[in-house]
Amino acid sequence: LPAVALALLTGCAAPRNSVTQIGVIDALLAGAYDGQTKCGTLLREGDTGLGTFDRLDGEMILLDGQLYQVRADGKVCSPTPETTTPFAVVTQFRPALSCELNGGITFREFQKRMDALLPNTNVVCAFRLTGTFRQMKTRSVPAQSKPYVPLLEATRHQSVFELGSCRGTVVGFRMPDFVKGINVPGYHAHFLTADRQAGGHVLEFTLEEGTLELAICSQIDLRLPTDGDSLKGIDFSRDRRMELDKAEK
């Protein structure tokens, strides 16, 4: 049976974590793919996180202060500091809890187990899961051309990668329902193999064994476009939750 071992990390008090977010998810869903913030700027705000790139060109993983770009052809690249992003979520990762997991845990089961470790489901939580996976299924999306189509349509042309048995790290955030329209409620995770040769947006996995680290975040710093045109014409009164579920999961 799957086993769990939980430990408080050393220290008298839980470290304070904050999240820096570039853009809003409903704008991305509507097709606002033009990059607004340079990766060099993003790296000053966090060492762990996820997102996408200008024109929706692949999946972003920020791990140990290094940025990686998983493109639709499966190649992993290192973006330049001048590369831009329309949407990203990063944090200076200082975990307060460490949890050992084993026994063939699926992504869905993992979410239930992690929820049980949280003080409640209305907190913002960053997490890292490093270990060996029996199977890992990820995706990436090709760069888009104007006029941009909505994200749901763009993901119909996504590349899906069945990585099989591998070692690596899942980086993600668990957001409360009250972020609807701004971020992704629930779980949003990206993956990078230990050899930095494959990864992407997590669709499914089965974990053999690994270490989960959790950081509760008490602040969100939201950075919005200042050019005046990026969000122009987007209907933010529209409920896009169904689109989000289909595009992200």
Per-segment meaning from a language model:
Residues 24-89:
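N-terminal low-complexity or amphipathic/hydrophobic leaders
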Residues 108-173, 180-182:
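Long, positively charged binding patches that form subdomain-scale interaction surfaces
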Residues 184-192:
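Histidine-centered divalent-metal-coordination microenvironment in nucleic-acid enzymes
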Residues 70-117:
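A glycine-rich, hydrophobic loop/mini-helix early in the fold
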Residues 193-235:
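A hydrophobic, small-residue-rich beta->alpha segment in the mid-to-C-terminal subdomain
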Residues 1-2:
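Bacterial N-terminal signal peptides that target proteins for export
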